[in-house]
């Protein structure tokens, strides 16, 4: 049996569909015949149901995965307030410990063929006074998929994030264009520019373009992703 695959999903910003795309990837991996699990190691914003604190993003990932992980393994750090994690963690007396997340990820790899790890916010969101989400990606040692929210300003955001990923010594395994603004002018031209630059500078393929959906439908979006190409990219990045 081949070693399990894993990928760290980050975004050009917050609220650009990172969870939506992660869920679509999980559906795609499952259709590809893989046992797919999800980690949302840090989640900010919780609600209580039946005496249990939950997070909407984590719920979406659970619904898409075909391997269920215990909540404490899937999300070791669940913060109640929906705000920047380092601020909320300090207020709630929580230390966001990377070693704990790495241990959870290691355990998840024993239960699935592929583990999708969704970051929090963009690529450099502070987690404490000295570490950010880029440090988390480095600690996990994973290739990265970048979700680009296609809206005004996305070209610079995409290229800057790709530079930051490279500076941390990580592989950009691919990127996804998620059309968050249906009224955006020159959307095709923006996507083409990002595609050409990331292919030339990072050899990072465009994994898929996801049309604007209302409501969001990750299972339908999975058909817009080239999962076979992503699997090959993840396998290549591992060697």
Curated annotation (Swiss-Prot):
Binding-site positions, ATP: 15-20, 57, 118-121, 178-179
Principal location: cytoplasm
GO biological process, one term: biotin biosynthetic process
Keywords: ATP-binding, Biotin biosynthesis, Cytoplasm, Ligase, Magnesium, Metal-binding, Nucleotide-binding
Keyword Cell membrane: no
Keyword Ion transport: no
Gene3D superfamilies per the UniProt record, alphabetical: P-loop containing nucleotide triphosphate hydrolases
Class of this enzyme: ligase
InterPro entries recorded: DTB_synth_BioD (IPR004472), P-loop_NTPase (IPR027417)
Cofactor: Mg(2+)
Pathway(s) annotated for this protein in UniProt: Cofactor biosynthesis; biotin biosynthesis; biotin from 7,8-diaminononanoate: step 1/2
Binding site for Mg(2+): 19, 57, 118
Compartments, as annotated in UniProt: Cytoplasm
Catalytic residues as annotated in Swiss-Prot or TrEMBL: 40
UniProt EC number: 6.3.3.3
Subunit description: Homodimer.
Family: Belongs to the dethiobiotin synthetase family.
Job of this protein: Catalyzes a mechanistically unusual reaction, the ATP-dependent insertion of CO2 between the N7 and N8 nitrogen atoms of 7,8-diaminopelargonic acid (DAPA, also called 7,8-diammoniononanoate) to form a ureido ring.
Name by which UniProt lists this protein: ATP-dependent dethiobiotin synthetase BioD
Organism classification: Bacteria, Pseudomonadati, Pseudomonadota, Betaproteobacteria, Burkholderiales
Gene designation: bioD
């Amino acid at each position: 049996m081949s070693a399990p695959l894993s990928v760290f999903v980050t975004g050009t910003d917050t609220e650009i569909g990172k969870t939506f795309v992660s869920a679509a990837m999980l559906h795609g991996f499952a259709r590809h015949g893989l046992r797919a699990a999800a980690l949302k190691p840090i989640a900010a914003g919780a609600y209580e149901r039946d005496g249990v604190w939950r997070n909407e993003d984590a719920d979406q990932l659970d619904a898409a995965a075909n391997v269920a992980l215990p909540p404490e393994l899937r999300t070791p750090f669940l913060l109640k307030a929906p705000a920047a994690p380092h601020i909320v963690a300090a207020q709630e007396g929580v230390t966001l410990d990377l070693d704990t997340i790495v241990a959870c990820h290691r355990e998840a790899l024993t239960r699935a063929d592929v583990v999708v790890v969704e970051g929090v916010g963009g690529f450099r969101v502070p987690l404490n006074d000295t570490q950010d989400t880029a440090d988390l990606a480095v600690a996990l040692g994973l290739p990265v998929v970048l979700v680009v929210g296609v809206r005004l300003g996305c070209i610079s955001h995409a290229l800057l994030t790709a530079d930051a990923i490279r500076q941390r010594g990580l592989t950009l395994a691919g990127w996804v264009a998620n059309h968050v603004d249906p009224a955006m002018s020159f959307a095709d031209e923006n996507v083409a520019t990002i595609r050409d630059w990331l292919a030339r500078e990072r050899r990072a393929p465009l994994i898929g373009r996801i049309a604007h959906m209302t409501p969001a439908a990750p299972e339908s979006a999975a058909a817009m992703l080239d999962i076979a190409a992503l699997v090959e990219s993840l396998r290549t990045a591992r060697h």
